[in-house]
């Protein structure tokens, strides 16, 4: 069996599609989320916060690949930095950073 894949932002707009595709392909999927969730549909959920670094280390442990889909209006560089550090310490072999283009808010 292939190594575990961790998806950050796996409950968001982009991430939930990534999780679905990986799960359908038979991958061992773990999701890092700020809110606790029960495991379901072959997906393990772990609670953590990329901004504070809390819970990242246990989430990346055992993941050979990390797909980073988490994004927000601010603080993305620090969040990515926290994830990269934890991934490096855990020996993750691959880190994929996905994002989506945001449309400017028409009222701003």
Predicted features along the sequence, with ranges:
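N-terminal Rossmann NAD(P)H-binding glycine-rich loop of SDR-like oxidoreductase domains
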Residues: 2-27, 33
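Short, glycine/serine-rich, charged loops/turns that create anion-binding
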Residues: 11, 36, 102
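Short glycine-/acidic-enriched loop or helix-start segments at secondary-structure transitions
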Residues: 16-18, 41, 77-78, 106-107
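A generic structural signal for alpha->beta connector loops
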Residues: 26-28, 42, 92
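N-terminal Rossmann-fold cofactor-binding loop
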Residues: 31-37, 49-50
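Active-site regions of enzymes building and remodeling cell-envelope glycoconjugates
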Residues: 41-49
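NAD(P)-cofactor binding segment of oxidoreductase domains
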Residues: 44, 53, 61-104
């Amino acid at each position: 069996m292939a190594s575990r894949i961790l998806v950050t932002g796996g409950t968001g707009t982009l991430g939930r599609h990534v999780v679905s595709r990986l799960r359908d392909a038979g991958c061992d999927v773990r999701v890092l989320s700020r809110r606790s969730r029960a495991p379901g549909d072959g997906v393990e959920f772990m609670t953590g916060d990329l901004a504070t670094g809390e819970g990242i280390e246990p989430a990346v442990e055992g993941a050979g690949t990390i797909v980073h889909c988490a994004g927000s209006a601010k603080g993305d560089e620090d969040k990515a930095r926290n994830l990269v550090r934890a991934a490096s310490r855990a020996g993750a072999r691959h880190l994929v950073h996905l994002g989506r283009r945001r449309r400017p808010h028409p009222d701003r």
